[in-house]
Each structure stands twice: as C-alpha cells, then as structure tokens.
C-alpha cells in the first residue's frame, strides 16, 4: 500500500490528467478513510457495536475494542503494561479496508454492471432469467427469500449460467500475478512435459486467454461474428448443457477440477455441479489454489441476489435514441424494431469489449457507458421480441 501511494505522489507533477486524477482520488480516499477510522476508534473505545457487516468497525475493534475494554475493567493491569498491543496497526487497518472495499465491492459491482449490459444485449437470455426467477420466487417479496431454500436452484440454473458466462468473458482481474518462491525453482507439468520455472520468476495468469481457449470449452460457430468458435460471444446456454467441443456429452467433471483443500474460505467449486464444469485451471475468475478469492461465494450470492430482485419485476433494454425517438419506435413494425435494436446491440458490444483495466476491468474510456432503459415487465418495446 505504501509503495502504491509513493508512486502516486511521485507522478502528481506529471502533465498527465490521469496522474492528477489518481492523486486527487488518493487524497480524497485518505481523508474519507481517516475520518471513518477516527469515528470507529471512538465507538470501539466506548464499547459501541453497530449493526450489520461493518468492515472498518470490525478491523478497528480487533485492535482497539479489547484493549479499551480491558483498560476500563482492569485499569491496574493497563498501567502495568499487561494490555496487549493492537493486533493491527493503524496503517494495517486502513490498508486492509482499501483492499476489502476494492476487491470485495468494486469487483462485484462491475460484475453486476456487465451482467445487466450483457442481458440487455441478449434479450432471449434475459427472458430465460425472468422465467426462472418467476418459477423460483413467484411474487414473493425479496425480504422473504431464504438462502438455504433457493441458492442451489439459482447457482445451478440460468442465473448461475449468466453469472459464470459474464465472469468468463469479463473477469474482474484479467492478469492474476503469481511468483515462484525465491528459494528454489518450481517444476510444473505442461501437456505431459516437465517445465522448470526459475526461482523468483514473476508470472501473470492470462485470465482472458484461458477463458476463451477452445481446447477447454464447448463451442460452436459464432452466429454473431461468423468466427469458427463462439467463445467471444455471451452465451450462457453453453453452461446448461454438458458437451465437449466434438459434440459428445460430458457426464462427469474432469478429475483435475476437484478441489478438496481447505484454504480457510468457501471450499466448493467455482461453478455448480448442475452446470458445465471446466477443467481446473481453465476458469479462474476467482483465481485458484491457496490464494484464491475467499469471498467468492459471497460475491456469487450478492450478484445473483441483485439480478434476481431486478428481473423479478423489471426488464432492461438498450436505449435506441441515437437511431429513433420514442414516437418513431411506437410506429415501427416488429421487424423494424429488431433492425434498430441490432444497431444498438452492435454498438454496445463494441463498447463493452473496449473495457480496460485500472485495478479492475471496467469501462474507463469513451463513451464509458452503455445507455439502457429499465422498464416494468410487460412494458417492453424490444426485450419481448428480440433474440
């Protein structure tokens, strides 16, 4: 964290707008975090515990809560120095808060954003999601939904397939950094051959490339691009049928996809057993192994929960204002609506595929957004007729 901040400070005087914006963001972030930190320290010292999942409060209490409680209950021990030192330094608390917010919130928000955009571009998939949500929840209000009763149906159905496909196409992190221990070389097996990685070597796992490698994924000729495979296309249906690239059915998961190790977090697979399960290492939106994302199940539940709430009552359509106004759309035939929506789809796909990475993958450049309309179910102009 210190190295990152030092880099920002060293570039603030560069005549580059991005550098100045990064520095300004750091200054604002530091101010907000210091204010929140001071507030949580005061609450911890007073023995206050707020409701909900308070990240900063939990970190602060791990260092200040127990110490202050002991000081109040046993002042003599505190004077003798028997009160332990904080488990985390102030810098550790602020650094961990930064990591948790970026890794645990921005990545999830990006995935929700991309999922909504992909479903707006793929109305047929959106209708399938709505049908599934209706079958599972009906008109039951979200506050009455039960995790244990519904999570497996969501993970193993169309909504889970949409999430998996979105993460395959637009993973939060496109290059996962790894390195070989400095003490010795590391030998790995690649296509049956031993490959030696030198000690201290830095390696980046190319998430985008492995997620689109026809060697590991069921694929067909693309109906969108005309290419011989459709791995650049958003196609959640590929997860619903367990088939290999030669068209034969895959009944069981590949042995190398098994993950029985307990690394302290959710220890299941990244995908549901009811869906297509790629060979281990070919699907890594949450990384893999001992340093894989500990919050992956929480992220999956948050994303699917948001999507289910939205599509229980609403539809999302691409805005076509660039090509036709509302009055013109009302006068269109279905074929004319499909034609104008196709233009919006083509532009939206181009925009999304232009996403870039600054910490995480998102729409940083121009235009930086995909215009959409959120309408109640039954009031759609395009989503009910376009595939």
State what each model feature region is.
Residues 365-387:
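C-terminal helix/juxtamembrane-tail motif
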Residues 205-273:
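Conserved cytochrome P450 K-helix/beta-meander segment immediately N-terminal to the heme-binding cysteine loop
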Residues 123-127, 253, 278-282, 288, ...:
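Cytochrome P450 heme-binding "Cys pocket" and the immediately downstream C-terminal segment
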Residues 50-53, 121-173, 198-199, 229-230, ...:
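Cytochrome P450 I-helix active-site segment
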Residues 26-111, 261-270:
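Conserved cytochrome P450 catalytic core segment spanning the I/J/K helices
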Residues 12-32, 51, 87, 148-161, ...:
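Cytochrome P450
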Residues 92-113, 190-193, 198, 202, ...:
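C-terminal, well-structured subdomains that either form a transmembrane helix-short loop-helix hairpin
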Residues 1-39, 138, 371-373:
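Cytochrome P450 catalytic-domain helical core, especially the substrate-recognition surface
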């Amino acid at each position: 964290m210190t190295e990152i901040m030092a880099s920002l400070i060293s570039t603030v005087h560069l005549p580059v707008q991005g550098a100045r914006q990064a520095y300004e963001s750091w200054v604002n972030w530091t101010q907000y975090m210091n204010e929140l930190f001071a507030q949580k320290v005061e609450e911890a010292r007073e023995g206050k515990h707020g409701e909900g999942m308070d990240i900063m409060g939990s970190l602060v209490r791990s260092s200040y809560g127990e110490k202050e409680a002991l000081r109040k209950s046993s002042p003599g021990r505190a004077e003798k120095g028997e009160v332990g030192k904080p488990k985390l330094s102030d810098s550790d608390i602020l650094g961990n808060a930064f990591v948790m917010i970026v890794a645990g919130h921005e990545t999830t928000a990006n995935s929700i954003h991309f999922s909504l955009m992909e479903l707006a571009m793929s109305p047929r998939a959106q209708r399938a999601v709505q049908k599934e949500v209706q079958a599972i929840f009906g008109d039951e209000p979200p506050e009455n939904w039960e995790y244990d009763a519904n999570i497996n149906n969501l993970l193993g159905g169309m909504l889970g397939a949409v999430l998996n496909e979105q993460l395959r196409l637009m993973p939060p992190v496109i290059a996962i950094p790894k390195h070989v221990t400095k003490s010795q070389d590391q030998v790995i097996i690649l296509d049956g051959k031993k490959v030696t990685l030198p000690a201290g070597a830095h390696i980046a796992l190319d998430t985008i490339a492995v997620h689109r490698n026809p060697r590991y994924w069921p694929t067909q000729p693309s109906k969108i691009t005309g290419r011989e495979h459709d791995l650049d296309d958003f196609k959640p249906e590929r997860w619903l049928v367990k088939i290999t690239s030669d068209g034969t059915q895959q009944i069981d998961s590949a042995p190398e996809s098994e993950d029985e190790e307990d690394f302290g977090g959710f220890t299941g697979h990244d995908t549901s057993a009811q869906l297509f399960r790629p060979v281990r290492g070919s699907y890594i939106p949450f990384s893999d192994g001992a340093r894989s994302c500990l919050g992956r199940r929480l992220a999956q539940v948050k994303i699917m929960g948001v999507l289910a709430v939205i599509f229980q009552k609403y539809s999302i359509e691409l805005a076509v204002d660039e090509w036709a106004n509302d009055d013109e759309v009302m006068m269109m035939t279905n074929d004319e609506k499909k034609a104008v929506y196709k233009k919006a789809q083509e532009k939206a796909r181009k925009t999304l595929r232009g996403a870039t990475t600054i910490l995480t993958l998102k729409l940083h450049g121009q235009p930086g957004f995909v215009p959409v309309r959120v309408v109640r179910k039954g009031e759609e102009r395009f989503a009910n007729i376009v595939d």
